[in-house]
Amino acid sequence: MSRWSLHFLGVGSASAIELGSASAVLERDGEPVLMIDCGQEALTAYLARYGAPPRALFLTHTHMDHVAGMERLFVQLYFDPARRGDCRLYLPAALVPWVQHRVADYPGVLAEGGVNYWDAFRVVPHTRGFWHEGLWFDVFEVRHHAPGTAFGIALPGSFVYTGDTRPIPEVLSSIGQGDEPIAHDCGLFGNPSHSGIDDLEREYPVALLARLHLYHYGSTADGDALRVRGYPVMQAGDDLALSPPRQR
């Protein structure tokens, strides 16, 4: 039987560079299956761990701590004929114009000309979810800045990953099989864009709180304070053991 895990490349908020930009990789038997988000530090950590660029990538939203590595990834993919156009980029359909505006629309992506940013990728837009390597991944909208601009991802039976979000009890109650570990955005204090631990304890039932594994916090000290509250707090380099996917 395959061994499944979620490897955390980084767990920090946008200002917590020392914790790495928030990103994780679904692994099967230690090999990467799907990278989630591609901040600058996340791409560096990915290359250090796996020795090659990702072959599959899902983006939760387009804030720069989650997409700043995309220009560098383009260069690495495009100039390797064996990888050019081979990286599957799974994009919620609503994010396609934002990736275009934020990353792909820079004039003259290569000085030599004759190249489109998207030539390096195999783009797979989706709404409710997508198939990858025979697995169905659920995709769901979260609460982060403007509506329709941020999304989470779940592999039924294995994990839920919220991406950046405020509390979403009504969403998490209907995603997955109901017993997966939930990697959840959580700082020591909340704000209009991100969850704080008091927000989660106020809005989530005890059974849901028991499934949380916290990431996207502001400092090592904040992480320690969250642990004192009794929650698992992920660190860069951690592996979260997963149950095998339960597919349709």
Short names for language-model regions:
Residues 1-49, 122-170, 238-248:
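Core dinuclear metal-dependent hydrolase active-site scaffold
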Residues 2-4, 85, 113-122, 133-135, ...:
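A short helix-to-beta-strand connector/capping loop
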Residues 7, 58, 90, 124, ...:
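Hydrophobic/aromatic beta-strand patches that form the interior of the parallel beta-sheet core
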Residues 30-34, 85-88, 158-159, 209-212:
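Short active-site oxyanion
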Residues 35-39, 46, 55-65, 92, ...:
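Active-site neighborhood of phospho(di)ester-bond hydrolases with catalytic His/Asp-centered motifs
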Residues 40-90, 178-180:
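Active-site metal-binding motif and surrounding structural segment of the metallo-beta-lactamase
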Residues 82-87, 94-123:
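Active-site neighborhood of divalent metal-dependent phosphoester bond hydrolases
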Residues 167-248:
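Cap/insert and terminal regions of metallo-dependent hydrolase folds
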